[in-house]
Amino acid sequence: MQSGKMKALMKKDGAFGAVLTEVPIPEIDKHEVLIKVKAASICGTDVHIYNWDQWARQRIKTPYVFGHEFSGIVEGVGENVSSVKVGEYVSAETHIVCGECVPCLTGKSHVCTNTAIIGVDTAGCFAEYVKVPADNIWRNPADMDPSIASIQEPLGNAVHTVLESQPAGGTTAVIGCGPIGLMAVAVAKAAGASQVIAIDKNEYRLRLAKQMGATCTVSIEKEDPLKIVSALTSGEGADLVCEMSGHPSAIAQGLAMAANGGRFHILSLPEHPVTIDLTNKVVFKGLTIQGITGRKMFSTWRQVSQLISSNMIDLAPVITHQFPLEEFEKGFELMRSGQCGKVILIP
C-alpha cells in the first residue's frame, strides 16, 4: 500500500481559485479502497468551488482536495474489502450513502437522506490518489479510454434525466448544453427520440450539440425557442423537456414548451428560489415534473456502461480539452468561459 506524499489540487481557503500542492497519500479504513487516478474530469460543481460562489461558501469546508469524476487503478484495499481487488480498473459512484435510511432500504439510495459526496464533503480526485468506499466502485472494461471512463458519472446524470421518461418516437428538448446537456442530447437520440432540440445561447456548445445528435439547435439570442418547438411539433410541444441550465427564464420557457401530458425533468440547480405558473403551465397541462439527482445505484451505471460498450453513443466529441494537473488553471478558465465541452485533468 502506498504511503508518503502526492500532488493534489487544493481549495486552501475561502477565496477564488485553487492551489497545487503536496499532501499525504490518503490512508484507507477497513471498508475503503485506494485508487491511483488516471484521469479526472472537471464538473460544473468544481467550477462553483473554484469560483467560491454563494453555494460553495455555504457548503464547502476548507482546506480540502476537490474533484469527483475520475478513473483509475486500485492500489490498496481495506482489510474488510473482498469485492474489489488490487489492480482493477475502476471509476466510482460519487454519492456515499448510509444504507440505513428509508430511501436506502426501499431501493432509492440515490436520494439517501444522509448522502455525502466525494470531492464535496470528502477529499476528492484532483490528485494522484483518491480513496472511496468499496461499495461505490464500478469496474471498467480494460479497453475503455481513461478519459471516457472518467465521465461516466456525469453521463449517468444525463442517462437518469432522459431515461426516467420514454423518449422513443417523441420530441425531446434539452435546455442548456453544458457537458451534461450535451450528453443528454446523445442519450435521447440513442433512446429513439424522433427529434432532439438543443437550446442554448453558446454557439460553440450548440455546434457540439449537433455532433452529439441534435436534430435542431436553437440559439436563444437569435430565435424564440417556444416558436421553434411549436413549429417542429405541429403546435403540440415537446414530449420531454430536460432542463439543464438553472436559469429562471429557461425554466419558465421549458414548462411552456412542454406538451400537454408531457414531462419536465430538471437536473439543474437554480441559484435562488424560482416562481412558476403552476396553474396554467403544470396543472391544466397535466404536466409531470421530476427532479433528478445523481444516478440510481447501480442501474443507471449499467445503462451507462451498455450505451458506451454498444457504441450507441459517441462521447469523443464532448471531450474537447486535456491538460496535465499542473495546468489546472487553463482547464478551469476554459470551463468558466464556456468555450469547451468536457475538460480532463491528468495527474
From Swiss-Prot:
Its cofactor is Zn(2+). CDD domains: TDH. Binds 2 Zn(2+) ions per subunit. GO terms for cellular component: cytoplasm. The active site is at T45, H48. Keywords: Cytoplasm, Metal-binding, NAD, Oxidoreductase, Zinc. GO terms for biological process: L-threonine catabolic process to glycine. It catalyses: L-threonine + NAD(+) = (2S)-2-amino-3-oxobutanoate + NADH + H(+). It is found in: Cytoplasm. NAD(+) binds at I180, D200, R205, L267, S268, L269, I292, T293. GO terms for molecular function: L-threonine 3-dehydrogenase activity; zinc ion binding. Zn(2+) 2 binds at C98, C101, C104, C112. It comes from the Bacteria. Its EC number is 1.1.1.103. Pathway: Amino-acid degradation; L-threonine degradation via oxydo-reductase pathway; glycine from L-threonine: step 1/2. The record marks E153 as: Important for catalytic activity for the proton relay mechanism but does not participate directly in the coordination of zinc atom. Zn(2+) 1 binds at C43, H68, E69. It is an enzyme of class 1 (oxidoreductase). Gene3D superfamilies: Medium-chain alcohol dehydrogenases, catalytic domain, NAD(P)-binding Rossmann-like Domain. Its main location: cytoplasm. Homotetramer. Belongs to the zinc-containing alcohol dehydrogenase family. Catalyzes the NAD(+)-dependent oxidation of L-threonine to 2-amino-3-ketobutyrate. This is L-threonine 3-dehydrogenase. The gene is tdh.
